[in-house]
Curated annotation (Swiss-Prot):
ARM repeats: 22-63, 85-124, 127-168
Keyword Cytoplasm: yes
Function of the molecule: Functions as a nucleotide exchange factor (NEF) for Hsp70 chaperones which accelerates the release of ADP. Required for fully efficient Hsp70-mediated folding of proteins.
Protein name as annotated: Hsp70 nucleotide exchange factor FES1
Entry-linked PROSITE patterns: ARM_REPEAT (PS50176)
Matching Gene3D superfamilies: Leucine-rich Repeat Variant (1.25.10.10)
Protein family (similarity comment): Belongs to the FES1 family.
GO CC annotation: endoplasmic reticulum
Source taxonomy: Eukaryota, Fungi, Dikarya, Ascomycota, Pezizomycotina
A Pfam family the protein falls into: Fes1
Keywords: Cytoplasm, Repeat, Translation regulation
Main location: cytoplasm
Length: 213
């Protein structure tokens, strides 16, 4: 089946050609040159396409065709894509938050670690994605991962990194973080999310406990 983007690109090209040939001052073509069409024009998939393709590999249950190494490479690609603010915001538009957070419960430690890393990247200095993480229930999942004593240290540290990014300058997430820590036996009073010193005290305290594990 033909790629619909290519059909749209062809329409745009024809309209442009006809318009300029008949009247150099003609209005723009009716078919809009969207980012998707630009991606087709440039001969490659859009970042959104790459994000979706990466997540399809990450969540694949076809062990014969997709190895753990394949999944980790896809995770690395996904993490690099969402370093871009627009791509991080697009996680919600592409409905990728739920499958991403599901990987925090994966049986493979490296998958859990990469999932936490990607969450941390996505929410760093980004209130929009911090809000989404809170809305989809990601904070309690990360606290659970960070405080689980039988969890490998490197995975727990990535969970703390994600939490550190999730709560800075975003009070609702900081409040829930403190509540969840208290539930886990790490009593934490209310913390001002805009005070980096206060946030660091909580985060570093958790890191120290992990270091002693």
């Amino acid at each position: 089946m033909a790629d619909p983007r290519l059909n749209e690109l062809l329409k745009w090209s024809i309209e442009q050609s006809e318009a300029t040939k008949n009247d150099p001052d003609a209005p723009p073509a009716k078919t809009q040159l969207t980012p998707e069409l630009m991606a087709a024009l440039m001969g490659g998939p859009s970042d959104a396409d790459l994000m979706k393709a990466s997540m399809e590999i990450i969540t694949s249950d076809n062990a014969e065709e997709v190895s753990l190494d394949d999944k980790l490479v896809a995770f690395d690609n996904f993490e690099q894509l969402i370093e871009n603010l627009d791509n991080a915001n697009n996680i919600a538009n592409l409905s990728l938050w739920t499958p991403l957070l599901d990987q925090l419960k994966h049986e493979e430690r490296e998958m859990r670690k990469m999932a936490a890393w990607c969450v941390g990247t996505a929410v760093q200095n980004n209130e929009k994605t911090q809000e989404r993480l809170l809305a989809v229930g990601g904070v309690p999942m990360l606290v659970d991962l960070a405080t689980k004593e039988d969890e490998p240290v490197d995975v727990r540290r990535k969970a703390v990194y994600a939490l550190s990014s999730a709560v800075r300058n975003y009070q609702p997430a900081m409040d829930l973080f403190a509540d969840e820590l208290t539930k886990k036996g790490h009593k934490t009073d209310k913390v001002d999310a805009t005070s980096m010193e206060a946030v660091d005290e909580v985060v570093n305290g958790l890191r120290e406990k992990i270091g002693k594990a």
